[in-house]
């Protein structure tokens, strides 16, 4: 079983990280090409392209300038502990055991606009480059054109290494679009998280993001290997609703206590 999630805009390169055997990101040749494109953009260009403040644009221009293909523990940190934000709040990597993190290294991948696909312990440097960014590059008009089949093939390879042909899609639509589903040889399960608010069950973005992280945590902590085991997910007060689910879309519901 392989789970995929989105990265996060919020990063943490300050707090202490447990000592794990780190790995190298696989697609730094590609990352370097994107960095070269981004370095040609002024902070004003970045502000417009990414719809961010002048302050954030300046920060990210500096990050692009400082980025280097060489990743070590002085300039980088493992992706699992670098990303913060709603999904990663639910995942809560800092509280995972060593065995859990080792399991995650084989069973979890993070999609990335700059790095393509990251294993949890792959080193990464601070950056902001969302997959949906319309960054013109030598391969096309956006990052989907840039990455082409590269991410899809890497995801398939990771699935093949599991041996059970199961992909759990916990990524946002923006990031999952970088995976060409028609080319994936696996049973793809998409968990959907609905919260009851004012008498109706619906997707509430903040809660859904955190729930995707909770599901990752559940898979990792319980070392899941079977599709049916996903239905037992109960973190955060969610429960599996078989009546609303299909063979490939697993619906989990929760009643919010106001």
Curated annotation (Swiss-Prot):
Coiled coil, from the record: none
Lineage of the organism: Bacteria, Pseudomonadati, Pseudomonadota, Gammaproteobacteria, Pasteurellales
Domain of life: Bacteria
GO biological process, any: response to hydroperoxide
NCBIfam families registered for this protein in UniProt: PRK02101.1-1, PRK02101.1-3
Name of the featured protein: UPF0246 protein HI_0984
GO cellular component: cytosol
Family the entry assigns: Belongs to the UPF0246 family.
């Amino acid at each position: 079983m392989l789970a995929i999630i989105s990265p996060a805009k919020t990063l943490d390169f300050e707090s202490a990280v447990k000592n794990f055997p780190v790995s190298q990101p696989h697609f730094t040749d590609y990352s370097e090409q994107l960095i070269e494109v981004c370095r040609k953009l002024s902070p004003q260009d970045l502000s417009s392209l990414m719809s961010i403040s002048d302050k954030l644009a300046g920060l990210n221009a500096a990050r692009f300038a400082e980025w280097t293909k060489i990743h070590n523990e002085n300039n980088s940190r493992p992706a699992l502990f670098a990303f913060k934000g709603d999904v990663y709040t639910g995942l809560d990597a800092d509280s995972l055991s060593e065995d859990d993190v080792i399991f995650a290294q084989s069973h979890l991948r993070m999609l990335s606009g700059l790095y393509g696909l990251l294993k949890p312990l792959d080193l990464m440097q601070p950056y902001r480059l969302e997959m949906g960014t319309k960054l013109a590059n030598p391969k096309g008009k956006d990052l989907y054109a840039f990455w082409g089949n590269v991410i899809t093939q890497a995801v398939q390879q990771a699935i093949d290494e599991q041996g059970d042909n199961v992909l759990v899609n916990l990524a946002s639509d923006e990031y999952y679009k970088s995976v060409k589903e028609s080319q994936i040889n696996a049973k793809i399960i998409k968990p959907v998280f609905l919260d009851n608010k004012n008498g109706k069950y619906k997707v509430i973005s903040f809660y859904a993001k955190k729930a995707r992280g909770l599901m990752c945590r559940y898979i990792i902590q319980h070392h899941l290997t079977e599709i049916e085991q996903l239905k037992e997910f109960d973190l955060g007060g969610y429960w599996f609703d078989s009546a609303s689910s299909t063979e490939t879309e697993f619906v989990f519901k929760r009643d919010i206590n106001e």
